[in-house]
Swiss-Prot record:
Function in brief: Intramembrane-cleaving aspartic protease (I-CLiP) that cleaves type II membrane signal peptides in the hydrophobic plane of the membrane.
Keywords annotated in UniProt: Endosome, Glycoprotein, Hydrolase, Membrane, Protease, Signal, Transmembrane, Transmembrane helix
Protein name (Swiss-Prot/TrEMBL): Signal peptide peptidase-like 2
Disulfide bonds: none
GO biological process, any: membrane protein proteolysis
Keyword Transport carried by entry: no
EC numbers on record: 3.4.23.-
Membrane topology classification: Multi-pass membrane protein
InterPro entries: PA_dom_sf, PA_domain, Peptidase_A22B_SPP, Preselin/SPP
Organism lineage string: Eukaryota, Viridiplantae, Streptophyta, Embryophyta, Tracheophyta
Gene3D superfamilies on file: 3.50.30.30
Domain remarks in the Swiss-Prot or TrEMBL record: The PAL motif is required for normal active site conformation.
Residues in the Cytoplasmic compartment per record: 220-250, 300-321, 369-377, 450-465, 513-534
Organism whose genome encodes this protein: Oryza sativa subsp. japonica
Length: 534
């Protein structure tokens, strides 16, 4: 990427984050049940279902445990009112690989994983009269219980559910102490319309529109560069005569391809070497970029609202003359980011993450620019291939989707922060709807370019490109969530839908209007004229 007048260190950190954020550009539903990679067979063709295991100890309700149903056996009810509350008992022997000496009739049996096949455990529990079987895993994962190749006749008519090791040990300990344990198994449906996804859809579109219109409708017309950063004042006329001297990264076609290659290498590094310390490194970088973005947005907004705020300055060592408002806002932004990092696992932490992320993306979309559609085609086409490869094709090579594994933080236990996310408030399974920064910034660069082109060409709202590209992005993002729904929540490469709906749309519109040549070469003549000037 080519840079023009690059002078500020925090902005360099924001660009580094732009490289990092590409690792989270797959929309993913981390809490969905997953049938991929485990083909069904005759008599063993149930769809895997997440199961809620509601439990009571001596009549007192405990914490709901989430389990996973098997490929075989009966399905658990969808409605809690159809699920029966049943007493549970430990199988004896605990592995349930031979006839139990404890009474299982009309009980839900609890057995330990191991020593024999899952189908064998289920048949023995069923023969003993059990009405269900809970299998305690040997770790916290929910292992997919399938049939073995030797199972030729499977006639299991009771539900079989895998539960995590910690929950199983707790249940076993209570039963060993003589407590009465009751359980209720059910698997509620997710809502057809996910309102949280609608809110996320609005946030993503709003971020792009806000970033595109920011300079004209938010930034002051006559504003000193000092509002933007703690920078030295270059001269008495630096604010008005050198406004274009602010940092702008104009992306080149070659730089776009290199960027995607570097992002791919970085994604592989995250996939293989992601750990808790690596996550902390990403968190620190995200906080730096978020502080920079929030500082720029707040100072710009306040200066726009209160003109006098942009007049008071103070002399600082090294920085020289800077706005007093800028100095006062830096601690607020820093404290905000630190508090988010400390409480990032809290239920409300998504609010702070989204605020920092939106501010960062608005700032990046002000700083990085596409000069024309030629460069946009190189960048978005490469990003399109990148997204599709690392989500859909990488499982054929790495046995799992690299993009989704990195976004979920499978190797570190924590998702990367370069995501906008909203809790599923109306989903009985909880979880988050997420969208990676790359799915907003890459198309956002093109939408912002279309607005600049419309302004330079003095076009109206309907005969320009900005409105139609905004609508195209909205449609593309809608198609992404529709694909998520149709694919049962399996992660989708959002750019698969967003690139055709934005880049494809502007190319078709430009060709139809006879303006494709102007869009393709926009800015090149101006650049050549600048180079020829003494």
């Amino acid at each position: 990427m080519a840079t023009h007048h690059a002078r500020r260190l925090p902005a360099a950190a924001a660009v580094l984050l732009l490289v990092l954020l590409a690792g989270g550009s797959a929309a993913d539903d981390a809490s969905s049940d997953d049938d991929a990679g485990v083909p069904p067979s005759p008599g063993c063709s149930n769809k895997f279902q997440l199961v809620k295991v509601k439990n009571w100890v001596n009549g007192t309700e405990g914490t709901i445990v989430v389990g996973l149903s098997a490929r075989f056996g009966a399905s658990v009810p969808r409605d809690i009112h159809e699920a029966q509350k049943t007493f549970a008992v430990l199988a004896n022997p605990l592995d349930c690989c031979s006839n139990s000496t404890s009474k299982l009739t009309n009980y839900i049996a609890i057995a330990q994983r191991g020593e024999c096949a899952f189908t064998a455990k289920a048949k023995i529990a069923q023969t003993g009269g059990a009405v269900g079987l809970l299998v305690i895993n040997d770790n916290e994962e929910l292992y997919k219980m399938v049939c073995s190749d030797n199972d030729t006749s499977i006639n299991v008519t009771i539900p079989v559910v895998m539960i995590p090791q910690s929950a199983g040990k707790k249940m076993k300990g209570l039963l060993d102490q003589g407590a009465r344990l009751e359980v209720q198994l059910y698997s509620p449906n997710r809502p057809v319309v996910d309102l949280s996804a609608c809110f996320l859809w609005i946030m993503a579109i709003g971020t792009i529109v806000c970033a595109s219109l920011w300079t004209e409708f938010v930034a002051c017309e006559q504003v000193d560069e000092r509002y933007n950063q703690l920078t030295r004042k270059d001269g008495p006329n630096s604010g008005t005569t050198n406004r274009e001297d602010k940092e702008i990264f104009e992306i080149s076609a070659k730089g776009a391809i290199v960027f995607i290659l570097v992002a791919s290498v970085f994604l592989l590094l995250l996939f293989y070497f992601m750990s808790s310390w690596f996550v902390w490194l990403l968190i620190v970088l995200f906080c730096i970029g978020g502080i920079e973005g929030m500082h720029v947005c707040l100072v710009t907004l306040l200066t726009r609202i209160c003109k006098d705020c942009g007049q008071k300055t103070v002399q600082l060592p090294f920085f020289g003359e800077v706005l007093t408002l800028s100095v006062l806002i830096v601690p607020f932004c820093t404290i905000f980011a630190i508090l988010w990092a400390v409480y990032r696992h809290a239920s409300f932490a998504w609010i702070g993450q989204d605020i920092l992320g939106i501010c960062l993306m608005i700032t990046v979309l002000q700083m990085a620019r596409l000069p024309n559609i030629r460069v946009a085609s190189a960048l978005l086409s490469a990003a399109f291939v990148y997204d599709v490869f690392w989500v859909f094709i990488s499982p054929l090579i790495f046995h799992e989707s690299v993009m989704i594994a990195v976004a979920r933080g499978d190797n570190s236990g924590e998702a990367i922060p370069m995501l906008l996310r909203i809790p599923r408030f109306f989903d009985p399974w909880g979880g988050y709807d997420m969208i990676g920064f790359g799915d907003i910034i890459f198309p956002g660069l093109l939408v912002a370019f279309s607005y600049r082109f419309d302004r330079a060409s003095k076009r109206g709202l309907f005969n320009g490109y900005f409105l139609w590209l905004t609508v195209g992005y909205a449609v593309g993002l809608f198609l992404t969530y529709l694909a998520l729904f149709l694919m049962d929540g399996h992660g989708q490469p959002a750019l698969l839908y967003l690139v055709p709906c934005t880049l494809g749309l502007i190319v078709i519109l430009g060709w139809f209007r006879g303006e494709l040549h102007d869009l393709w070469n926009y800015g090149r003549s101006q650049t050549e004229n600048l180079v020829d000037e003494p």
